[in-house]
Amino acid sequence: MGKTLGVLSGVGHLPVDVVRGAKKAGYRTVAIALVPGTHEDLEKEADVFHAINIGKVGKIFKTLKQEGVDEVTMIGKVTKEILYSGGILVPDWQAIKILMSLPDRHDDTIMNALVAKLEDMGIHVMDQTLFLTDLMPQEGVLSKRQPTPEEWEDMKYGFAMAKKIGGLDIGQTVVVKNKAIMAVEAIEGTDACILRGGKLGKGAIVAKTAKPAQDNRFDMPGVGVKTMESMIESGCAGIVMEAGRTL
């Protein structure tokens, strides 16, 4: 019997892509939707589907064990603001214990604690990109229009600045115009950062990079249709992302 992969799923199409890729590779797939609004195809594609609130960590762990999950991947959009906005996150005692044990609420701190718990249970946490390598662009201009010399300068500057805020575990995205930072991504997420920064500097450049010490098991940078829509809405001129390290 083949291995069973647990897919801890956020919003977007990436969890569906992972499920499809895993099934082609011979895995039995168990998808757990952690937040409202996961893709409608997820339940159709996965061999087993559960919807469990992201705060019910004990129930999530129990379900993974009951389903015989050997490996797990965490994929899809889950914004950290749910920790603070109320209404979505309903933590159980296991979640509270984990959060109370942490020195801070940085993304990497929270995710590393969850990874450690899963590994202690004998469940290997898989590289997010394993079944998504065809979605990782290589170096080069992806659009029909080439950047202007001024846009190239902003792209180089923005890329360097995004790396710096990533190193501080603040976010992965900055919006720049004329080598000045219009917006920095924090807890609000990429789209809100783009909307805020683009409106401050029309024709601005978005830069999104992996963190200098990026752990491929979680929080790989992603650029999707919603990213493009936010750029169009706010009047941004282009985006630079990290080749081979962006979904």
Which role fits each region the language model picked out?
Residues 2-13, 184, 215-218, 245-246:
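Short, glycine-rich nucleotide/cofactor-binding loops
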Residues 17-18, 41, 83-85:
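Short glycine-/acidic-enriched loop or helix-start segments at secondary-structure transitions
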Residues 57-131:
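N-terminal glycine-rich phosphate/adenylate-binding segment common to multiple enzyme folds
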